[in-house]
A protein has these predicted regions:
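Phosphodiester-processing cores and adjacent nucleic acid-binding clamps
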Residues: 1-253
Length: 253
């Protein structure tokens, strides 16, 4: 079994979050026999050029996206999502992705400390030609409702997204399990419920591993980065539950 393509991968260019440089991630993907590799840094396209260059050098297809916070029109958080650019369309997907990131960094002064995009603005950018796919994963508003075992709330949240993103191919549910304790974020239970929601609503679903590092041992470095991001000493904030957020081979996925 080979060729699993990871579609949610943060590199070391995701400040205080990702661990591994894009080039090393791409090398590992190529070594696994994967024909394409994605990068989805948080809040920007910071590692995209390095990623694309490494992919072209090794003869595999680059996939580029971004992990962004989403806001409602009042500036309230709707969780985070992954946005992937479509390829083979004359650069439309890349152009849309660049516009999305630019809008995310141009929030009104009242919420300027955040990087994020209003769902209505995202919908406007993807309304006609599409060009990107939005993945709603465990830390989206849909995923958080699923985590709370609020099925009606999850369906309502998903319907709000479907109302905004009506262009075919612009919306999918992201299934992630880091084998955490049942009932907690990134658990098998949450992943199963997300898949059930996708099936019930006829929404496409994709499996990812929400990758932060290359190998399990790199989780220690991720803990240090989390400490810097939270501005808290280790032990004073909720840590990673385990070391599962690595670039797993297909058999492990």
């Amino acid at each position: 079994m080979s060729g699993f393509i990871h579609l949610n991968v943060a590199s070391a260019f995701s400040g205080h979050f990702g661990v591994t440089r894009p080039e090393r991630m791409v090398e590992a993907a190529a070594a696994q026999g994967i024909q394409a590799a994605a990068i989805t840094d948080r809040d920007g396209l910071y590692g995209a050029v390095k990623h694309i260059g490494a992919c072209l050098q090794l003869g595999i297809s680059p996939i580029v996206g971004v992990n962004l916070a989403v806001l409602d029109d009042s500036g309230n958080q709707l969780g985070r999502c992954v946005i992937l650019a479509h390829g083979n369309n004359g650069g439309l997907g890349w152009a849309k992705l660049c516009k999305i990131v630019s809008v995310a960094h141009a929030l009104p002064k009242a919420i300027k400390k955040r990087v994020g995009i209003a769902r209505s603005a995202l919908a406007d950018l993807l309304r006609d030609e599409g060009g990107c796919t939005v993945l709603l994963g465990p830390d989206s508003d849909v995923g958080l409702e699923v985590l709370a075992a609020n099925r009606s709330g999850a369906i309502e949240a998903l319907e709000a997204w479907r109302e905004c993103l009506k262009t075919p191919g612009t919306l999918a549910i992201e299934i992630v399990s880091h084998i955490t304790e049942p009932g907690t974020e990134l658990s098998v239970l949450q992943a199963r419920r997300m898949l059930q929601l996708a099936d019930a609503t006829k929404t496409p679903a994709v499996l990812t591993n929400a990758v932060r590092y290359l190998e399990p041992d790199d989780a220690l470095t991720a803990d240090v980065l989390d400490s810097a991001r939270h501005l808290e000493a280790l032990g004073l904030f909720k840590p990673q539950p385990n070391a599962q957020a690595w670039l797993k081979p297909a058999i492990s996925m």
